[in-house]
UniProtKB/Swiss-Prot annotation:
GO biological process: isopentenyl diphosphate biosynthetic process, methylerythritol 4-phosphate pathway; terpenoid biosynthetic process
Protein's name in the database: Bifunctional enzyme IspD/IspF
Residues at which a divalent metal cation binds: D233, H235, H267
Organism the protein comes from: Parvibaculum lavamentivorans (strain DS-1 / DSM 13023 / NCIMB 13966)
Chain residue ranges for the region called 2-C-methyl-D-erythritol 4-phosphate cytidylyltransferase: 1-226
Protein family (similarity comment): In the N-terminal section; belongs to the IspD/TarI cytidylyltransferase family. IspD subfamily.
Name of encoding gene: ispDF
Organism domain of life: Bacteria
Catalytic activity as recorded in UniProt: 2-C-methyl-D-erythritol 4-phosphate + CTP + H(+) = 4-CDP-2-C-methyl-D-erythritol + diphosphate; 4-CDP-2-C-methyl-D-erythritol 2-phosphate = 2-C-methyl-D-erythritol 2,4-cyclic diphosphate + CMP
Any one GO molecular function term: 2-C-methyl-D-erythritol 4-phosphate cytidylyltransferase activity
Pfam family for this entry, one: IspD
Reported cofactor(s): a divalent metal cation
Amino acid sequence: MKVAALIVAAGRGSRAGPGAPKQYRLLAGQPVLRRTLAAFANHPEIMTVLTVIHPEDASAFEAASGGLPKLLEPVFGGSTRQDSVRAGLEALNADAPDLVLIHDGARPLISAPVISACIAALSTHEGAQAGLSLTDTIRRTDKGMAAETVARDTLWRAQTPQAFRFNAILDAHRQASGGEHTDDVSVALAAGVKVAMVEGDQDNIKITSAADIQQAERILMRSGETRTGLGYDVHRFGPGDYVWLCGVKVPHDAGLVGHSDADAGLHAITDAVLGAIGAGDIGRHFPPSDPKWKGAPSEIFLAHAAKLATEAGARVSNVDVTLICELPKIGPHADAMRARIADILGIEKGRVSVKATTTEGLGFTGRGEGLAAQAIVTLIIG
């Protein structure tokens, strides 16, 4: 049985406020759409994933989807959701899937069990829709005043995926051409296709506003696996009149000696990220014996580690780095360092701490021979 996923991501939703379309906004360090695509691309029963996008979003889609398996070339949507789904179905027709799951690109927290339940329902039904049976009391109103209670035993709150036998939903959309249906179950019902309801998931929310992104982040924090990594680095002082620390150029009466720019702070954070995902250390990825990295800015190393973390399904929750030295003074530069680290990792500055301490004159740092950095990074997987 060949199962395809059709992800509808051609909208321009204005409720999320100014900026990128909601499906390309960052959710805990990753674009919303990437999380949606990954949920289907990583599902063992899904064979292909086709995305319907807005013509202006080709570059954004490429950036958001890079490296994911099973993805077909996206197609452009139309002026309505119905038009966009029709375009996607016509494109999938050449691939001849048996089943198709149609899902909102702005629902990034769809779970594997709900996907599986929708597919399973198609063994006995032409269509299936995820949804939530209502538990709250439902009441009609009359001019703002409470009126009669509505029986809730037949009421569901609709979600996606909406899953169908492929030929049935393609024919239904062709029959509905020019109509104004708001979802695919409506299209199916109009064509006489019977659709079963499948219990969905409370966490399968649709991102329509900034508040929804905050709610989704809370859900991810609650449900994800926590990983912690520890990094430590040392560099000695040498000739120079500045040092690089945590991505910031700091004036000093000496420089730091190293193969790259000797930024001990970023090196420690890089090792912490790599350690949290079990990817070795900075030397494995950027060996000091390679002249390519001579004098290289250390932000390259941290950005690479962050990319590996993203590919492993992880996101950075927070970073805590301690710089150990007598001089230079870190306090005046700490805020700029926090901002630079946050920018490299694509997280909020409030998730980054930079602080300094001394060894009270003891050891090589106490003698002013060099400095050290220690970093702890917390990642959330899931």
